[in-house]
Amino acid sequence: MTLRLQRRRFRFALLRPLRTAAGELRERCGWLLRLDDDQGGVGWGEVAPLQLQQFMACEQALAALPDELPQAQLEAVLREAPGPVGFGLGAALAELQGVVGAGAPQGWLKAPAPALLLPAGEAMLAALEVAAASMGGLESCTFKWKVATAPDGLERQLLEQLLQRLPPTARLRLDANGGWDRSTAEAWMQRLRDDPRLDWLEQPLAVEDQAGLDQLAALGPVALDESLDQQPELRSSWSGWQVRRPALEGDPRLLLRELQAGLPQRMLSTAFETGIGRRWLEHLAGLQAQGPTPAAPGLAPGWTPAGPMFSNDPEQVWAAAA
């Protein structure tokens, strides 16, 4: 079967910059993909790397693809392509094949209530107050706070204030984006390991320090994120929680099969997608919620703007990028 591939550039700014130990994220840009077959079927994808070096690799990979190609060639390409390209091509193929979407028995699933993403530093406290006011309290909410962005002493003080404000039914995830050293990460774990509100410390140490991550995981809950992107073999060997960002990790049909098989301790997280990528994120999060270890997905509500670029209708997203 011959497929026709179209690409369209997109760009949008976050509502406010996201500060992490790895830097500051202000906008997202990439390519939307439209894949048509000769039967009138259409599949949609999105390619949006986070790192500049990966952006250039994705641009080269997309430029090397012809506008028309057989399905077998596309399948071969996406297996070797950078992760974001693999996601975009695999997502479009899966929809075209009826694996997901209107042609699938379940259609597109909706995600459960997400975790709330708190900004780094002292802005966290103000954001927490806004959340409490808008929701009428913080009971049974899950919060993710970006840490390792300010002096450790200040963040430890902020942590104590945060813990004082969180009710017993709330849940807390702390994301260091690999920004701590071993002694700092161990100090945070010792403080929090006996707190029933702790979900996990997320990527507390650098990707290169897998031995340190293993040692820390013996003390308390550790979730890997960046490690899974840079060392994909850990997706099959890490026994703790995995923060999975499907838009970055390649063909989404692989993660789809994992969740359909009921593999535990996968938590779905956003890379700030358009409406096309968001459909996949929410569908996978909906599947995860049906599995053995349901967890609030990291959808980062309130960080991306509204409008047709974020519609559930891919035609509207495509038109908005024109």
Enumerate the predicted regions with their spans.
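Active-site-proximal loop/turn and secondary-structure-junction residues that shape catalytic pockets
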Residues: 49, 118-120, 147-151, 178-180, ...
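Aromatic-anchored, glycine/proline-accented short structural segments
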Residues: 170-232
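Structural preference for beta-strand elements that scaffold enzyme active sites
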Residues: 32, 86, 111-115, 140-144, ...
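Short flexible/disordered coil segments
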Residues: 63-72, 170, 178-183, 204-210, ...
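Active-site-adjacent beta->alpha loops and helix N-cap segments on the catalytic face
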Residues: 125-126, 149-163, 180-184, 205-217, ...
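N-terminal capping/lid subdomain adjacent to the active-site entrance of alpha/beta enzymes
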Residues: 1-172, 177-179, 183, 190-195, ...
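Short, aromatic/basic amphipathic alpha-helical patches
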Residues: 131, 162, 187-188, 215-216, ...
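Shared catalytic-loop signature of beta/alpha-barrel
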Residues: 208-209, 215-221, 226-322
